[in-house]
């Protein structure tokens, strides 16, 4: 990422003598808000009125922002310090460095600084506008991060299927029927270099419909990450009838699988259930690699919960360089909260107890049983359709 020509990114490092004790990733980018009401619920008519004003007639709000953390990822990855450096000392060091940071590409420092993300306890109250990180900053919370737990004793994908409730397992099988004609082909570095522009165009098909954007993926990013991470960064091309209709990519890290980016042609989504199948492939990769978790990110909460993802609250710390704007933004944050969602519960209760050690904490998020909606037109064709299980062709990756 540091070498990407399209990105304005830098690494911060802290030393004690000759010893490296801390690192952080900082990137200057542009945030773009569209249809904010899809993710944030206003608790005041005044907040709704202000939101309409700042978004203008076009309903779009753009502003430069300096981000401490990965602009394209979700999770606690803003900075890292050695264990003997206390959390308070680490936060103070990052705060001081960001405040004194250099000017951006325009010759000026962005007026907004964002540090992301921080885990929140499920039972924590509203954090919008409060000092969740340090004084002089205020918290902001959007949708939770959705993660799928993987049992330590699971030896194959069938163990995942067996851990689901009947209706959820039926849905996974229905996804398999819908996408039965798809090939999932893992790309080598040379193939990623050759296909980078085409893959990026598929990504833009999805990115263009996002309600909130923080930076974006560049075609060059795929090549650089594949070159740097090798087999731990997988890029999967999805073909249907010989045509490339989508792709997915992700990381294998110490803490689990990180679903990174996907792209697909919208016209194929409903017929082939491409997005749902991508989620299943990430979960398969997690099971087969022995990872404890599969991080599926923040979007499409309902769909992800239907295949076993659980919500984990995350907050960001925000600071405006302009004191007046900072006060107004903090006040607005206090009048908003993440929009409540009704999530499905896909797991058998005894499985959750054995995998997590306790019942999952939903932090006020309502749950409901998994119900099948809009069945795939292929699902009821043939007497043996209900017996189809997820599988890949001989040329496909096992992820």
Where are these regions (language model features)?
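Short, intrinsically disordered C-terminal tails of secreted or membrane-associated proteins
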Residues: 390-398
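Alpha-helical membrane-targeting segments
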Residues: 38-70, 321-355, 371
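Acyl-donor binding region in acyl/amide transferases
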Residues: 31-138, 256-316
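Active-site/acyl-donor-binding loops of N-acyltransferases
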Residues: 29, 76, 132-164, 240, ...
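A conserved beta-strand-loop-helix scaffold within acyl/acetyltransferase catalytic domains
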Residues: 1-43, 114-270
């Amino acid at each position: 990422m540091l070498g990407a020509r399209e990105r304005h990114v830098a690494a911060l490092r802290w030393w004690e003598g000759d010893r490296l004790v801390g690192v952080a990733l900082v990137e200057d980018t542009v945030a773009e808000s569209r249809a904010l009401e899809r993710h944030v619920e206003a608790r005041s008519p005044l907040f709704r009125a202000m939101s309409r004003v700042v978004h203008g007639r076009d309903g779009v709000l753009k502003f430069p922002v300096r981000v401490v953390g990965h602009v394209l990822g979700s999770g606690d990855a803003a900075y890292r310090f050695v264990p003997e450096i206390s959390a308070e000392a680490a936060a103070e060091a990052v705060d001081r460095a960001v405040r004194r940071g250099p000017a951006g590409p325009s010759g000026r420092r962005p007026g907004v600084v964002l540090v992301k993300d921080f885990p929140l306890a499920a039972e924590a109250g509203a954090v919008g506008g409060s000092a969740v990180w340090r004084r002089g900053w205020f918290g902001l919370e959007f949708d939770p991060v959705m993660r799928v737990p993987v049992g330590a004793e699971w030896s194959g994908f069938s163990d995942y299927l067996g851990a689901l409730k009947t209706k959820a397992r039926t849905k996974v099988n229905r996804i398999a029927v819908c996408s039965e004609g798809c090939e999932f082909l893992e790309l080598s570095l040379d193939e990623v270099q050759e296909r980078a522009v085409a893959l990026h165009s598929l990504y833009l098909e999805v990115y263009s419909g996002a309600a909130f954007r923080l930076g974006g993926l560049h075609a060059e990013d795929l090549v650089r990450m594949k070159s740097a991470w090798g087999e731990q960064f997988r890029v999967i091309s999805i073909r249907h009838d010989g045509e490339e209709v989508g792709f997915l990519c992700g990381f294998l890290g110490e803490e689990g699988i990180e679903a990174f980016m996907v792209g697909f042609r919208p016209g194929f989504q409903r017929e082939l259930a491409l997005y749902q199948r991508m989620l299943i492939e990430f979960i398969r990769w997690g099971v087969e690699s022995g990872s404890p978790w599969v991080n599926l990110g923040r979007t499409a909460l309902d769909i992800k919960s239907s295949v076993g993802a659980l919500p984990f609250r995350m907050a960001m710390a925000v600071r405006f360089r302009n004191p007046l704007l900072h006060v107004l933004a903090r006040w607005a944050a206090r009048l908003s909260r993440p929009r409540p969602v009704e999530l499905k519960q896909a797991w058998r209760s005894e499985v959750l107890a054995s995998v997590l050690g306790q019942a999952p904490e939903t932090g006020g998020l309502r749950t409901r049983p998994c119900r099948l909606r809009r069945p795939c037109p292929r699902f009821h064709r043939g007497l043996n359709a209900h017996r189809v299980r997820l599988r890949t062709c001989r040329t496909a990756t096992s992820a």
